[in-house]
């Protein structure tokens, strides 16, 4: 069976102001299955943002588990992330899931992987998915050379990624925290 390909997710932070955005395209082989998928969510009483890339069903499973860990740890982002990735790495079923998550609150941005990685990226930005490298490059240039707010940087980065990556479209969802 062919793999679902999707997406571009990018997160930009300036201090405690953070924006997380993603495109809406889901592709199966060379066919666009959906152009309006929502891959960005607000979690834990709207205090945490989460975005996912990878196999859609796998990503939803991981996001649900992350949300349960957030509830268990009263919204403590780092503890929830470490516990999720520990489970993800050691559980035989979870280990097969093919997805990545970016999660953020007003203090931290984290990238979570199935290898058990909990990465806090440098430069106040992170990007994942098929268009992630394009979006990250664009965001880094804008972060270094402009005073644009995070949501404007995320928007422009997603536009650039959508122009370059066939698995990324121009239908964006952007959520913010702080200000």
Swiss-Prot record:
The active site is at residue 7. PROSITE patterns: PROTEASOME_BETA_2 (PS51476). Its EC number is 3.4.25.2. The keyword Transmembrane does not apply. It is found in: Cytoplasm. The gene is hslV. InterPro entries: ATP-dep_Prtase_HsIV_su, Ntn_hydrolases_N, Proteasome_sua/b, Proteasome_suB-type. GO terms for molecular function: metal ion binding; threonine-type endopeptidase activity. This is ATP-dependent protease subunit HslV. Belongs to the peptidase T1B family. HslV subfamily. GO terms for biological process: proteolysis involved in protein catabolic process. Keywords: Allosteric enzyme, Cytoplasm, Hydrolase, Metal-binding, Protease, Sodium, Threonine protease. It catalyses: ATP-dependent cleavage of peptide bonds with broad specificity. Coiled coil: none annotated. The lineage of its organism: Bacteria, Pseudomonadati, Pseudomonadota, Betaproteobacteria, Burkholderiales. It comes from Bordetella parapertussis (strain 12822 / ATCC BAA-587 / NCTC 13253). It holds the Pfam family Proteasome. HAMAP family: HslV. Transmembrane segments: none annotated. The keyword Chloroplast does not apply. One of its GO terms (cellular component) is HslUV protease complex. Allosterically activated by HslU binding.
């Amino acid at each position: 069976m062919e793999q679902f390909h999707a997406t571009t997710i990018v997160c930009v932070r300036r201090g405690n102001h953070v924006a997380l955005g993603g495109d809406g395209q889901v592709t199966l082989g060379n066919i666009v299955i959906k152009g309006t998928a929502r891959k960005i969510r607000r979690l834990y009483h709207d205090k945490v943002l989460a975005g996912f890339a990878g196999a859609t069903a796998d990503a939803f499973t991981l996001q649900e588990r992350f949300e349960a860990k957030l509830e268990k740890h009263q919204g403590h982002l780092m503890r929830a992330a470490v516990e999720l990735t520990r489970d993800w790495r050691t559980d035989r079923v979870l280990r097969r899931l093919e997805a990545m998550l970016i999660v953020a609150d007003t203090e931290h941005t984290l990238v979570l992987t199935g290898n058990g990685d909990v990465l806090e990226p440098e430069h106040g930005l992170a990007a994942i998915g098929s268009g992630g490298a394009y979006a990250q490059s664009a965001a880094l240039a804008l972060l270094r050379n402009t005073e644009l707010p995070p949501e404007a940087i995320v928007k422009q980065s997603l536009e650039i990624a959508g122009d370059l990556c066939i698995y990324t479209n121009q239908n964006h969802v952007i959520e913010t925290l702080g200000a």
